[in-house]
């Protein structure tokens, strides 16, 4: 039998985002270089923490690895929002906005979405396509209509590309591959 001891498998109590990447300043993340080196058609892995051995722990939502579906659950104060912020930032550091973008659905009154936008300056994470909060019911309904419209738009673009390239099927991974090869003109992000 395997015997675990607390000393061998102790997780760090706190690691901030920059520390996780081994840098001291945002500029040292070299996001533009990381964007150029990434290949979202092969992997969507991004660091989300440090494991018990002090190594980066990565999550990959590519369909060929951990998969694109997940659930985050926990008690109040357990770190759900911190995890989401870390994961969104980590994907943004590693993938160009043409490759990965986010619509945040925030039912905490906009507090989570506020982590990605400075209300004073208007500067926001370039990957942030929009936010939906529970504060305005009319806005929430408009946002859901917009999401449905975007799904129809993507289906149309995929169908056009499928016909133009004589492909049987096209999914987001194949489409992005064609985009990076210059075979289609419009970027579509995950």
Task: Outline where the language-model segments fall.
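Long, charged, glycine-rich C-terminal linkers/tails
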Residues: 163-173
